[in-house]
Amino acid sequence: ELPQSAAGRTIMTTEPKFVPSNAAKIQIDDFSANVRLVDCVGYVIPNAKGYEDENGPRMVKTPWYDEEIPFIEAAEVGTEKVIKDHSTIGIVVTTDGSIGELNRVDYVEAENRVVTELKEIGKPFIVLLNSTHPMLPETERLAEKMQEEYDVPVLPISVENMTERDIYNILGEALYEFPVLEVNVDMPEWIACLSANHWLKKIYVDKIRESVI
């Protein structure tokens, strides 16, 4: 079952969706990765609709509790569990307020909560700034401001109009957020045999160090 999405203020997602059920192998530039997306509500924002009904808080079933719980609580619990237990990297999708009826200010608190939580648990992530006009100077300025504030890549993009190439760029940018833990270098045997102080070997080592730091 695919996640649902629509224009307007009404929340469409009711529970996390894993797409596809089994990870798909995707080639990105010079390396491949097994990818499975987990779509979740995130934190409910002011002026959104769908988390209450005529009887008060909307009650929903979740995989984590036997009984129904309020939608807002379910959204928060689900989001936290997805971030902590079911993901290795995060893509935070927020907006400049141009995509619908909600303003930029409505998203900021929830956006900060997600970013703070990802930083606290050390999950690598990037931010997508969804906009109907991602190329305009004011959108790029907002992305730059957010990038400076959050210290992570912030990519302005129109999610509705993005291409396959855009998706590859997003995945590539996200994967580059993983820290480099080890670099293996294959040198010709005759260079490996030289002493560590040999001038030629030192040139090789210095160039390798420059390229990875």
Where are these regions (language model features)?
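Canonical P-loop GTPase G-domain recognition
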Residues: 113-126, 131-197
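Switch- and interface-adjacent substructures of P-loop NTPase systems
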Residues: 2-123, 160
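Generic structural signal for well-ordered, non-membrane alpha-helical segments
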Residues: 2-5, 111, 139, 201, ...
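Charge-patterned, long linear interaction tracts outside catalytic cores
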Residues: 198-213
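Residues that form generic nucleotide/phosphate-binding pockets
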Residues: 82, 170-174, 207, 211
